UniProtKB/Swiss-Prot annotation:
Family to which the UniProt record says this protein belongs: Belongs to the bacterial ring-hydroxylating dioxygenase ferredoxin component family.
Cofactor note: Binds 1 [2Fe-2S] cluster per subunit.
Full protein name: 3-phenylpropionate/cinnamic acid dioxygenase ferredoxin subunit
Pfam families: Rieske
Described function: Part of the multicomponent 3-phenylpropionate dioxygenase, that converts 3-phenylpropionic acid (PP) and cinnamic acid (CI) into 3-phenylpropionate-dihydrodiol (PP-dihydrodiol) and cinnamic acid-dihydrodiol (CI-dihydrodiol), respectively. This protein seems to be a 2Fe-2S ferredoxin.
Cofactor: [2Fe-2S] cluster
UniProt KW keywords: 2Fe-2S, Aromatic hydrocarbons catabolism, Electron transport, Iron, Iron-sulfur, Metal-binding, Transport
This protein's record includes keyword Cytoplasm: no
Entry's Gene Ontology BP terms: 3-phenylpropionate catabolic process
Binding site for [2Fe-2S] cluster: 42, 44, 62, 65
HAMAP family referenced in this protein's UniProt entry, alphabetically: HcaC
């Protein structure tokens, strides 16, 4: 895994999301003080999940076609999406957020 610096904790208030411009682009969410990172592109359509509708039960609804995903597992919870989103481990260290990304393949 390749650990990257995402942002300070203060940049993602509770109930909000932040787009992290890395490769791949990540959507970072704060749900009740817990942070979740998923692929920012909906698996059904070309929509940014960081612009989606965050629910208290750690799910996010795509802003384009209302597909819903679990932030913990990436599982698609309703149609029209059927494919999951990739999730990434998140670590908070000293007020900063880091995300583990897979190593780039040669």
């Amino acid at each position: 895994m390749n650990r990257i610096y995402a942002c300070p904790v203060a940049d993602v208030p509770e109930g909000e999301a932040l787009r992290i411009d890395t490769s791949p682009v990540i959507a970072l969410f704060n749900v009740g003080g817990e942070f979740y990172a998923i692929n920012d592109r909906c698996s059904h359509g070309n929509a940014s999940m960081s612009e989606g509708y965050l629910e208290d039960d750690a799910t996010v609804e795509c802003p384009l076609h209302a597909a819903s995903f679990c932030l913990k597992t990436g599982k698609a919870l309703c149609l029209p999406a059927t494919d999951p989103l990739t999730t990434y481990p998140v670590h908070v260290e000293g007020g900063d957020i880091f995300i583990d990304l897979p190593e780039a393949q040669p």
